[in-house]
């Protein structure tokens, strides 16, 4: 049993006999029969006839680099093409004639990767194909660059913190407050009207040696909120964004229907029909009592048809931007000029904008605000100083467009808008392109338009109920209602004809 274990492979009796000198001698004896795979030791070595005859029957004990060296040195010009090297190896060692094509790939790899072989282009006066290969007696050694030691992660953190402390200066902190130019270019304003100017009541004190900020004195970027207020502002903007999307979703198929109707070219409609489909809210804060008296408004029946049509006729297919409905009567419409620098005024603006009725408003008018909110949604509402400044600027554009923000400091918002005649392009679009749908009906069963009003108005969609009669106009002096006089004749209505509708020319009023 012991003899079996001693003769087995697990026996380690040979371990004490192993020495370094014996291993070196054994490796030298084994290396005599076959050359190493590296570069040849002697670039000018040649294969003798005796060695070629001794290894003619079997596989030669030479590496591919030695075979290439012997082939090139056998040529008189000390150069050979790849096909000539193949031919020389097959002629001197018949083993490679039936060895397949794998050895040829090894020859090509040695020529390309070994530095002692150099490729020489064929001269123009030398006919034939392929370049020549020669032996380079002094090959260029690759200069191995020293590898840079990778720093420890703790060292990287300490170095970054040190650089941040060095770069931290009053000049850099002042530049952080300003809005960069790339952020302002990413949110362009799609309006041709100039933005209202804002004055800063308490400007931020800057060091005397610092540079001037990148914003103008009239821009809305002159605010510096602490980072502790960023989560509250992000939540406010997020609730505003979701509120706008939710109220826009209530429109449903109305947007699609309105977009289809806006693309159709409708025929011109009578002036009395166009001027009769607008319901307005009138603000009497900045208007004089004489301007509100019904006697100062010219009667519609007293104007000639041509003059009346020239004043009020407007093609119904022209695009008309709709403003949102006004907030509740108890909500304050005025905001201070420095609202963007005060956190309380900014929160108040969120309440005012959220209280507006956006169900009938196309948000493409405020693409800058929606784009800023969409970018914030993509960032998961983790906003920085620059993004909040861009959102405040877009919100300022929204408030100034809707008239909630005064455009001039000395006048209220109600005095800013000029007195314009009412138009019904947006109202006709909401009714599907058929004018006269919301016209008032008098006691004789005839249609009559509502009274013409002037002042800062808000266009109301068709969701509000219409009165069966013309609403009375009140004056501030006596508070007595006065009904305007309208022509008793019925206006001629022309509807867009389609292939499915049948034109009805019968006068149904004659039966009544």
Swiss-Prot record:
Transcriptional activator. GO terms for biological process: positive regulation of DNA-templated transcription; regulation of transcription by RNA polymerase II. SUPFAM superfamilies: Winged helix' DNA-binding domain. Residues 304-323 have a biased composition (Low complexity). The lineage of its organism: Eukaryota, Metazoa, Chordata, Craniata, Vertebrata. One of its GO terms (molecular function) is DNA-binding transcription factor activity, RNA polymerase II-specific. Residues 25-58, 143-213, 284-326, 448-512 are annotated as: Disordered. It is found in: Nucleus. Gene3D superfamilies: Winged helix-like DNA-binding domain superfamily/Winged helix DNA-binding domain. InterPro entries: FH_FOXJ2, Fork_head_dom, FOXJ2/3-like, TF_fork_head_CS_1, TF_fork_head_CS_2, WH-like_DNA-bd_sf, WH_DNA-bd_sf. The gene is foxj2. This is Forkhead box protein J2. GO terms for cellular component: nucleus. It comes from Xenopus laevis (African clawed frog). Its main location: nucleus. Residues 501-512 have a biased composition (Acidic residues). Residues 59-150 bind DNA. The keyword Transcription applies.
């Amino acid at each position: 049993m012991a003899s079996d274990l001693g003769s087995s492979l697990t026996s380690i009796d040979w371990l004490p006999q192993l020495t370094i000198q014996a291993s070196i001698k054994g490796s030298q004896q084994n290396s005599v029969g076959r050359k190493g795979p590296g570069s040849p030791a002697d670039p000018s070595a040649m294969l003798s006839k005796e060695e070629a005859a001794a290894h003619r029957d079997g596989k030669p004990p030479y590496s591919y680099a030695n075979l290439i060296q012997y082939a090139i040195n056998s040529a008189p010009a000390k150069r050979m093409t790849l096909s000539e090297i193949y031919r020389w190896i097959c002629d001197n060692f018949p083993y490679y004639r039936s060895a397949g094509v794998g050895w040829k790939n090894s020859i090509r790899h040695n020529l390309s990767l070994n530095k002692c072989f150099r490729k020489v282009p064929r001269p123009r006066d030398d006919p034939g194909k392929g370049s020549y290969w020669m032996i380079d007696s002094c090959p260029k050694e690759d200069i191995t660059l020293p590898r840079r030691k990778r720093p420890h992660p703790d060292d990287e953190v300490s170095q970054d913190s040190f650089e941040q402390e060095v770069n931290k200066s009053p000049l850099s902190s002042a530049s952080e407050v300003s809005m960069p130019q790339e952020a302002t270019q990413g949110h362009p304003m799609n309006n041709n009207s100039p933005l209202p100017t804002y004055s800063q009541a308490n400007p931020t004190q800057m060091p005397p040696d610092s540079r001037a900020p990148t914003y103008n004195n009239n821009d809305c970027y002159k605010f510096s909120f602490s980072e502790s207020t960023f989560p509250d502002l992000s939540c406010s903007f997020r609730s505003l964004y979701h509120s706008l999307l939710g109220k826009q979703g209530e429109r449903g198929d109305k947007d699609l229907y309105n977009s289809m109707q806006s693309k159709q070219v409708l025929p011109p409609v009578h002036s009395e029909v166009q001027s009769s489909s607008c319901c307005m809210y009138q603000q009497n804060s900045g208007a004089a009592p004489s301007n509100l008296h019904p006697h100062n408004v010219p009667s519609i029946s007293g104007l000639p048809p041509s003059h009346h049509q020239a004043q009020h006729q407007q093609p119904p297919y022209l695009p008309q931007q709709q403003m949102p409905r006004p907030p509740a009567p108890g909500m304050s419409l005025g905001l201070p000029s420095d609202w963007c620098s005060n956190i309380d005024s900014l929160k108040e603006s969120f309440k005012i904008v959220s209280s507006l009725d956006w169900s009938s408003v196309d948000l493409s008018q405020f693409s800058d605000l929606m784009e800023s909110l969409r970018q914030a949604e993509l960032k998961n509402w983790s906003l920085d100083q620059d993004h909040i400044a861009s959102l405040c600027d877009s919100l300022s554009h929204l408030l100034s467009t809707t008239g909630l923000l005064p455009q001039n400091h000395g006048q209220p918002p109600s005095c800013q808008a000029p007195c314009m005649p009412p138009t019904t392009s947006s109202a006709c679009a909401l009714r599907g392109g058929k004018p006269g749908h919301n016209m008032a009906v008098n006691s004789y069963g005839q249609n009559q338009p509502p009274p013409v009003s002037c002042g800062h108005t808000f266009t109301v969609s068709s969701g509000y109920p219409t009165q069966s009669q013309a609403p009375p106009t009140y004056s501030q002096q006596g508070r007595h209602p006065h009904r305007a006089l309208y022509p008793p004749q019925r206006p001629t209505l022309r509807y867009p004809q389609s292939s499915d509708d049948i034109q009805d020319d019968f006068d149904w009023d004659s039966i009544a």
